[in-house]
Amino acid sequence: MVDFKADERLNTLNHSCAHVMAQAVKHLYPEAKFWVGPVVKEGFYYDIDLGENAVNDDVIAAIEKEMKKICKEGKKIYRREISKAEALELFKDDEYKLDLIDGLEDGNISVYDQGDFTDLCRGPHVDNTKLCKNFKLIKYSGVYWKGDANNHVMQRIYGVCFPTAEELEAHLQLLEEAKERDHRKIGKDMGLFMVDDLIGRGLPMFLPKGYTIWQEPVSYTHLTLPTILLV
């Protein structure tokens, strides 16, 4: 599986695509606010505060549609440096960005502009949004701001981006194959175990078939352990 963070080419491209996604979200939800949007091993993500709006499959489809529009428009991406005071003024309506800026040392801060969207970022980025056209948003989840359960929940949207459509399709095929091998899917499809949110998702409960399978190595251990101890 591709490591997007380690591959410099994919790292830059996916970092840029995260900004395209943020711009699309801002078009659809003008009141949206943004925390961080890094590249990780699996691609990229952005943590977003959508207020009372929740992310679902329809929202993801709408964001992807707007992203395709932005990519097709081929917006030039520019890097510029501003002072910390200018950054605080520029992002004065986004408390998440203000929190990030407050944590930076005094001096110039880099931002990236693409069309009507500006974001705080170290970079680097590609020079045009059209280079981000081969993307896919792959999953979403709720996360606590800064990973602190005492904070409110933000929406984290994950995606991947490749230089070519062929590379994207090949990667999506690998993800689909991995999903088919996932023990959670296999367990559900074969009726081996179930999970209950009231008990805890990390505490699966065996169903009859699963219990039978689990008993096999347990029984074998009971039969062979005395022999092993005598050796």
Indicate where each model-derived feature is located.
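N-terminal catalytic cores of NTP/NDP-binding nucleotidyl/phosphoryl-transfer enzymes
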Residues: 2-31, 35-38, 125-127, 203-215
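Mixed-charge, low-complexity segments
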Residues: 192-201
